[in-house]
A protein has these predicted regions:
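FIC/Doc superfamily catalytic core
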Residues: 1-282
Length: 282
């Protein structure tokens, strides 16, 4: 909830979001506080949603935008676009086309849900939904919630995976993938982007499970915390991130145990002391 709202520029902190959800008094924009209440109420309905029902989509949008917009729970009746200052960089389809386009999208999902993999189908829906921009407000929040709804109907574990948090982390890439798809006229780049995010999420979950199962040392945990996925690091750059000066301490306590547990791999495994050696977090 916090991450999905942050993507939409809600300024409340994580602690403030928690306080709102727990019914505590929070000093802040009433609109932003209402957004938190609405998003929490919408996500509470996740297990009741039929992701292939347009009626349910409008129902959840009504919850997500309650007390915030006049057209809550209804498709927009006005025209919408994305602007960079005074320049329109994307114009959504005309309002008169929304019912037809949304029916086509939901019909396509129903027809293909048993033949197209849910990870791909949900990403296609996410992009097409953002492109159609069916509501006057809340389209981004609804797209991300519905993405989760489709996947959690397939595998309930997806209702617990931090999809929105991952998108927030790679927010620039998220919007770039959408913009590139607008130009290309297809959703392939967005599908690839989302699959990469799920791959990262599952890697992180795997590490967390290993951490609890194998009692990873605090040294290795610190090492993994400072390393990003798929980024090749030199030993010196990692030592700088860890604020270490002793190469022996670094090897003995941090890097060697991580390599032994297959949490970090070497780019030149047959020559551990190579000057070209780099380390990549798995």
């Amino acid at each position: 909830i916090y991450s999905s709202l942050r993507i939409e520029a809600n300024a409340l902190s994580l602690n403030e979001v928690r306080d709102v959800i727990n019914g505590h008094v929070v000093l802040g924009s009433q609109k932003e506080i209402q957004e938190v209440k609405n998003a929490y109420a919408a996500y509470e309905k996740l297990d009741q949603i039929d992701p292939y029902s347009m009626k349910d989509l409008k129902w959840i949008h009504g919850i997500m935008t309650s007390f915030l917009v006049q057209e809550s729970g209804e498709f927009r009746r006005g025209e919408e676009g994305v602007f960079d200052g005074d320049e329109c960089i994307f114009m959504a389809p005309p309002a008169r086309m929304i019912p037809h386009l949304m029916k086509e999208l939901f019909d396509w999902m129903k027809e293909n849900k048993d033949t197209i993999h849910p990870l791909i189908l949900s990403a296609v829906f996410h992009y097409e939904f953002v492109f159609i921009h069916p509501f006057s407000d809340g389209n981004g929040r609804m797209a991300r919630l519905w993405h989760t709804a489709i996947l959690s109907k397939w595998k309930p574990v997806f209702s617990y995976l931090p999809v929105e948090s991952q998108i927030e982390k790679f927010q620039e890439g998220y919007y770039k993938a959408i913009a590139d798809c607008h130009i290309a006229g297809e959703s392939n780049l967005f599908i690839e982007f989302m699959l990469e995010q799920f791959d990262r999420i599952l890697d992180e979950v795997t590490v967390q499970l290993r951490s609890s199962d194998e009692n990873i040392s605090e040294y290795v945990k610190r090492l993994l915390d400072v390393m990003e996925y798929d980024v090749p690091y030199t030993a010196k750059s990692i030592m700088d991130l860890l604020q270490l000066k002793s190469r022996e301490t670094f090897r003995k306590n941090y890097m060697n145990p991580a390599i032994e547990m297959n949490l970090v791999v070497m780019t030149v495994p047959d020559k551990p002391q190579s000057r070209n050696q780099r380390y990549i977090k798995k």
